[in-house]
């Protein structure tokens, strides 16, 4: 590929092009390139669902509990493979391509290209930042949850067009890149599945063996003081006292939290933390549980490491605990996030819309305590697997960033 000059407003050329292509691109009004198609009365066709960023999928494969009246299917719109769909969330995610023929909601607008083209070319273009945030945004009407794309405004938007042979080159590149990203994502999911199975195997074997002690949580762990600072009382960056927020425990942190390497929010300087004694500040080996969640992820925890010379407190909706005995670093982090331990928590969870677990309940659970050598072995195995998963995630991000960069440079 070669870098070329940017558009001067008269001749439009992308910044990056495949060899052999130098002709300027044309820009047509959307209605000149695409026909607004309304083709109804096909109730026997496959009902399709929009998956943002992925196009269409047969409704029964979408994994969603969507209710609809069979009698209304005659009013649904027919789409052909390669058509484009303006759906209810297009204002934030772009247009989606029909991956197969079928019928879709009558609320959608169906676009069919009038000129020779590559559908994958426009599928890529309709997901670029330039199109969504600088072009499509001109056709958005309404505010907040009422936002939608007005076709009457959309049809006047300028849409680029180049020779089909160049479109094919560009679409082939993104097809290969998308396939590579999909495989990388599958690798991450496979590694996570393997990790869960390995964790189950390791701790189930410990529970069945005679070389481990089974101890009561309340006899092994001391519950520490936590604070109730909200997100508004925290800042990202700085050298203040770190704060472990329950939302980060649930979503951001893994079984182990390294305070030296993780960017943990700090408590704003104007907040009074004088009531917290030295014993309240987190140390290596302490474990922080999230005691509230919107689902059964409640009880997720993270073990603290890298706490040397770093002041950190446990925050809102957390249960910070300190082991009374010596444990191998990271062992408790992996044990408390194992299915073996979580199964003990499930009967203790309270609430309907919001799930929670109390300190008085968690102290009744049991901890498997093998010898230090076995603890170290388990922690080492699980940590190495986490490193492998993190590396695979970073590769996924790098590939997505590469795709994003190419999307910006290969289109005008």
Region roles according to the model:
Residues 2-5, 16-20, 70, 134, ...:
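Short, recurring structural edge motifs at helix starts
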Residues 10-14, 88, 103-109, 142-165, ...:
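A short glycine-rich beta-alpha junction/loop motif
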Residues 13-41, 205-233, 240, 364:
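Non-catalytic DNA-recognition/assembly elements of restriction-modification systems
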Residues 16, 28, 129, 152, ...:
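Structural detector for helix-capping/boundary residues
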């Amino acid at each position: 590929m070669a870098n070329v000059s940017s558009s001067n407003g008269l001749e439009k050329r992308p910044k990056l092009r495949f060899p052999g292509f130098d002709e300027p691109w044309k820009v047509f009004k959307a209605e000149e390139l695409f026909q607004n198609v309304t083709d109804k009365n096909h109730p026997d066709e496959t009902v399709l669902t929009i998956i943002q960023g992925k196009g269409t999928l047969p409704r029964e494969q979408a994994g969603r509990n969507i209710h609809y009246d069979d009698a209304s299917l005659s009013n649904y719109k027919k789409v052909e493979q390669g058509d484009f769909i303006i759906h209810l969330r297009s204002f934030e995610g772009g247009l989606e391509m029909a991956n197969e023929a079928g019928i879709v909601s009558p609320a959608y607008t169906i676009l069919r290209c009038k000129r020779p083209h590559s559908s994958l070319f426009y599928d890529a273009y309709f997901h670029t930042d330039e199109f969504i945030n600088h072009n499509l945004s001109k056709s958005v009407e309404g505010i907040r949850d009422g936002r939608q794309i007005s076709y009457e405004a959309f049809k006047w938007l300028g849409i680029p067009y180049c020779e089909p042979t160049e479109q094919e080159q560009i679409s082939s590149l993104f097809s290969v890149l998308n396939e590579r990203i999909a495989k990388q994502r599958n690798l991450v999911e496979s590694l996570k599945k393997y990790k869960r199975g390995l964790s189950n195997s390791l701790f189930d074997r410990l529970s069945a063996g005679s070389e481990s002690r089974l101890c009561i949580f309340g006899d092994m762990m001391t519950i520490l003081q936590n604070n109730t600072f909200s997100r508004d009382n925290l800042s990202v960056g700085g050298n203040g006292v770190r704060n472990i927020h329950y939302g980060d425990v649930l979503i951001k942190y893994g079984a182990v939290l390294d305070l030296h390497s993780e960017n943990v929010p700090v408590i704003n300087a104007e907040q009074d933390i004088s009531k917290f004694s030295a014993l309240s500040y987190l140390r290596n080996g302490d474990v922080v549980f999230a005691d509230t969640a919107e689902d059964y992820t409640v009880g997720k925890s993270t073990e603290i490491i890298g706490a040397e010379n770093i002041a950190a407190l446990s925050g809102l909706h957390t249960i910070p605990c300190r082991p009374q005995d010596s444990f191998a670093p990271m062992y408790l982090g992996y044990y408390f996030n194992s299915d073996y331990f979580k199964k003990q928590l499930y009967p203790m969870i309270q609430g309907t819309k919001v799930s929670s677990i109390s300190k008085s309940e968690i102290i009744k659970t049991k901890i498997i305590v093998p010898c230090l050598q076995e603890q170290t072995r388990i922690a080492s195995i699980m940590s190495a697997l986490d490193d492998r998963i993190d590396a695979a995630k970073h590769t996924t991000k790098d590939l997505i960033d590469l795709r994003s960069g190419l999307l910006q440079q290969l289109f005008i």
